Amino acid sequence: MHYLDISFTYKNTDISVREKLAFDSDEKKEQILKLINSNKNIKESMVLNTCNRVEIIASVEDVKAATAHIIRCMSIFSGVFEDELYERADIYENSGAAHHLFAVASSLDSLVVGETQIVGQLKNAFKFAYDNNSCGEDISKIIHYACKCAAKVRNETQISKNPISVSSVAVAKAKEIFGTLEGKTAIVVGAGEMGELAAKHLISSGAEVIIINRSSERVEQLVDSLGDNASWDSILKLKEYVNNYDLIFSSTAAPHAIITGEIIEPREFHRYFFDIAVPRDIDLLNTELISVYTVDSLEEIVRKNLALREEQAQKAYSIVGQDTSEFLKTLKEDMSVPLIKSIRKQAEICAKNELEKAIKKGYLKHSDYDEAQKLIHQVFKAFLHQPTMKLKGLADEERASELSNGVKFLFDIKDEQNFQAGDIDEI
């Protein structure tokens, strides 16, 4: 088994391509996972989809064949040519996949380093794949360690102190433009997670917020939680709001743009649109009186954030490196456990059979059986110590699979039993 992570992020893929790759509905995610898992080289898979990244995480039998299949599946769904996907993708396997995923979970690979949303998004992506029978023990193990690593980074560094997100960066840019947001009214389109964060940051900066949403139930609850500086209205009045206010943030789950040139009317004041959705909500060109900022165009503030957190990021990467090594060590031992257990079980059965023969033939008294069994156990425990240590180190050897198969042949082991690392006592 090999771990594989095929990654498309803001670093290697611009937003115009990322939005084509976005699996922005449960139906799309379910379809892509079924298609990916239809190949014999894929054991398990999950898809992580955020505004800044689309990643396929999988456990596979053959890395090259599995990569080709996954790229082909993504090309079918997105309409992007396979050659372009290969050119853009960062492809990680085994230790590289673990290190990358741990860094992602710890928000070190995020556009906004230190943002706190990613670990929740990772957990939700795993839960969706698990609930849809797309992943199991292999991916469960690496996600568990990734979340554990993220918690350690959060607790042992200050990288998430004063946590920020894409939404907060967008609000910071608005403050930079206007000087202050005190007394301003901002329009937030969408009441999802990103919209909620934008509204909170706007209100904390002194602005009043009007949230525009399709469903009344969700937005009513949100407005109640935000207090007196928040109100809401129907998405049916979107045209009215985008033409009468100068500060608009949009983050809906719509599969297509909802703010287009068709609903924009000429005005004599400058309007600023912040599109923090992927796929994009806003399809407008920058003009003399209209400025549009997307996720990818907030880089200057992001760079400042990265510089401020550089020292903490170095500490965090050290933790990621340590946790990656620990995970690989555990994985290595887990891989050898069934084989080790099978050899020990075979030795126990052989010893028991010989003891029973000795008693039947009168070579050994019944009263000596327990003592003889203890002695034999100690003998084969000592005898198997060195082979056990060697087997636990097989994952570090280039010929690990070949050596493991050789051991199975020598001991005539047909089927290894499924045990966990905790089942093996220290020998």
UniProtKB/Swiss-Prot annotation:
The top EC class is oxidoreductase
- Sequence positions that bind NADP(+): 190-195
* A Pfam family of this chain: GlutR_N
GO MF, one example:
glutamyl-tRNA reductase activity
Ordered alphabetically, the record's keywords are: NADP, Oxidoreductase, Porphyrin biosynthesis
Q: Which reaction does it catalyse?
A: (S)-4-amino-5-oxopentanoate + tRNA(Glu) + NADP(+) = L-glutamyl-tRNA(Glu) + NADPH + H(+)
The UniProt entry, under PROSITE patterns, shows:
GLUTR (PS00747)
- Kindly state a single biological-process term from the GO annotations of this entry: protoporphyrinogen IX biosynthetic process from glutamate
Q: Identify the residue position(s) of the site Important for activity.
A: 100
InterPro entries, A to Z: 4pyrrol_synth_GluRdtase (IPR000343), 4pyrrol_synth_GluRdtase_dimer (IPR015896), 4pyrrol_synth_GluRdtase_N (IPR015895), GluRdtase_CS (IPR018214), GluRdtase_dimer_dom_sf (IPR036453), GluRdtase_N_sf (IPR036343), NAD(P)-bd_dom_sf (IPR036291), Shikm_DH/Glu-tRNA_Rdtase (IPR006151)
Q: What pathway annotation does it carry?
A: Porphyrin-containing compound metabolism; protoporphyrin-IX biosynthesis; 5-aminolevulinate from L-glutamyl-tRNA(Glu): step 1/2
Location of the active site: 51
Respond yes or no to whether keyword NADP is given for this record.
yes
Q: Where is coiled-coil annotated?
A: none
Q: What is its EC number?
A: 1.2.1.70
Q: Which residues bind substrate?
A: 50-53, 110, 115-117, 121
Does ATP-binding appear among the keywords? Answer: no
Quote the record's domain comment.
Possesses an unusual extended V-shaped dimeric structure with each monomer consisting of three distinct domains arranged along a curved 'spinal' alpha-helix. The N-terminal catalytic domain specifically recognizes the glutamate moiety of the substrate. The second domain is the NADPH-binding domain, and the third C-terminal domain is responsible for dimerization.
Quaternary structure and interacting proteins, as annotated: Homodimer.
Extra remark beyond the main annotation: During catalysis, the active site Cys acts as a nucleophile attacking the alpha-carbonyl group of tRNA-bound glutamate with the formation of a thioester intermediate between enzyme and glutamate, and the concomitant release of tRNA(Glu). The thioester intermediate is finally reduced by direct hydride transfer from NADPH, to form the product GSA.
Q: Which family does it belong to?
A: Belongs to the glutamyl-tRNA reductase family.
- Biological role: Catalyzes the NADPH-dependent reduction of glutamyl-tRNA(Glu) to glutamate 1-semialdehyde (GSA).
What is this protein identified as?
Answer: Glutamyl-tRNA reductase
Gene behind this chain?
A: hemA
